């Protein structure tokens, strides 16, 4: 998958990609967009930390490639901060595209000033140990979706959606088609037409 294709996924955004993918791959939990306005897509580097521990986050940043989306998980989601400003600074310096944290983050004002796109399940100052060796680049589950290393993660204000690389070309084409269709529809809606009529819903409801 080229950088251009990642950029296109990011441009179309989570909702459009999710619908174009047949309503598949949505990470079905509330994610906090730490840096407002962030819109990113990139390949997943998956991380499973030990319970209450973030040693593997340090390892992940050391092994990350530019453009990676780090997917940070615990054995069970918990409001424990896996990332603060020091780790975020390192990730940013190594050109990580984004962090998806199925746990908490802290130092939020500093994170926003840094500007690294981060999505987390919680904001919490509660810290971790650094003792337990977990795993890198093995499948993890977030919000009911299994994420494998290299899966495309699309993130924006609506949350996150996962696209397997094997489906990327098909989903991107469907996304482009859906976006083009909506672009032609919007002026008609602005002019006062209704999807109730345009999509045949009136006939379904009223006969």
Question: Over which residues does each language-model region extend?
Answer:
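Feature captures the catalytic cores and cofactor-binding loops of soluble hydro-lyases/lyases
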Residues: 1-149, 163-195, 200-207
């Amino acid at each position: 998958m080229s950088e251009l294709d990642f950029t296109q996924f990011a441009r179309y955004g989570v909702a459009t990609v999710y619908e174009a993918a047949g309503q598949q791959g949505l990470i079905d939990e509330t994610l906090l967009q730490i840096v407002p306005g962030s819109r990113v897509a990139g390949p997943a580097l998956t991380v499973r930390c030990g319970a209450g521990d973030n040693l593997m986050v340090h390892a992940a940043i050391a092994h990350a490639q530019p453009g990676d989306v780090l997917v940070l998980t615990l054995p069970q989601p918990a409001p424990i901060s896996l990332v603060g400003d020091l780790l975020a600074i390192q990730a940013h310096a190594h050109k990580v595209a984004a962090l998806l944290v199925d746990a908490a983050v802290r130092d939020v004002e500093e994170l926003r000033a840094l500007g690294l796109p981060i999505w987390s399940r919680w904001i919490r100052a509660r810290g971790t140990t650094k003792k337990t060796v977990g795993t890198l680049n093995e499948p993890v589950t977030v919000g009911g979706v299994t994420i494998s290393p290299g899966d495309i993660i699309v993130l924006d204000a609506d949350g996150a959606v996962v696209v397997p690389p094997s489906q990327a070309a098909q989903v991107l084409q469907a996304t482009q088609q859906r976006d083009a269709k909506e672009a032609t529809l919007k002026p008609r809606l602005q002019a006062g037409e209704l999807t109730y009529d345009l999509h045949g819903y009136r006939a379904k409801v009223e006969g």
